Amino acid sequence: MYKTWRLCRTHTVGGLCHDGSHRFVSTGGAKIGKKFENMNQIRDYLSRPVWSVHEYLGINTKEEKLEPPSAEAVKKLLRLSGLPLEGADIKEIQMRLAKQLSFINKLHNIPVEGEKHTKEYDARLVQRNTKQLNYTKLLEGISHQKQDAELGEVSGSWKATGLAAESKNAYFVVKEGLLKNRK
């Protein structure tokens, strides 16, 4: 689709772009679709539904097929969320939770094109095989960092204890009676 992508910084006054973020710039000439001419075209495009929630809610399925959570689980959820137990329609809440769980299960079962590629960037609660970060790797990573003068970063300019009322040898001084003797 794109020939190449590169990360670049857009510089303006003071070395920062107007929103302080990095921008992606395409060096290729990719065409996605017709260019929008005005805000009405954008609103029309965004208001057109691509898919309906009703497809995945299972409204046509009978309520007997749904497996509602137990009444004890619903009461526990109500207590944990701080909602009142008194006057709560437990049966209605069970059916709503069953429909929501059914919807979530159907979303998880939707086939995704290029699933091998998307698994690397999966944001679901999936265990990832990451390498453990230890103290030596952290120090090694810090040693390779350099300040960017274009962004106004100056090496050694920040002192953590600079605004502290009392400090000694670049450490904060905490007195025992600090919170006890407050007025």
UniProtKB/Swiss-Prot annotation:
Keywords: ATP-binding, Ligase, Membrane, Mitochondrion, Mitochondrion inner membrane, Nucleotide-binding, Protein biosynthesis. It comes from the Eukaryota. It is a peripheral membrane protein. GO terms for cellular component: glutamyl-tRNA(Gln) amidotransferase complex; mitochondrial inner membrane; mitochondrion. GO terms for molecular function: ATP binding; glutaminyl-tRNA synthase (glutamine-hydrolyzing) activity. One of its GO terms (biological process) is glutaminyl-tRNAGln biosynthesis via transamidation. It catalyses: L-glutamyl-tRNA(Gln) + L-glutamine + ATP + H2O = L-glutaminyl-tRNA(Gln) + L-glutamate + ADP + phosphate + H(+). Pfam families: GatF. InterPro entries: GatF (IPR027499). It is found in: Mitochondrion inner membrane. Its main location: mitochondrion. The keyword Membrane applies. Its EC number is 6.3.5.-. Belongs to the GatF family. Allows the formation of correctly charged Gln-tRNA(Gln) through the transamidation of misacylated Glu-tRNA(Gln) in the mitochondria. The reaction takes place in the presence of glutamine and ATP through an activated gamma-phospho-Glu-tRNA(Gln). Required for proper protein synthesis within the mitochondrion. HAMAP family: GatF (MF_03151). Present with 172 molecules/cell in log phase SD medium. Subunit of the heterotrimeric GatFAB amidotransferase (AdT) complex, composed of A (HER2), B (PET112) and F (YGR102C) subunits. This is Glutamyl-tRNA(Gln) amidotransferase subunit F, mitochondrial. The lineage of its organism: Eukaryota, Fungi, Dikarya, Ascomycota, Saccharomycotina. The gene is GTF1.
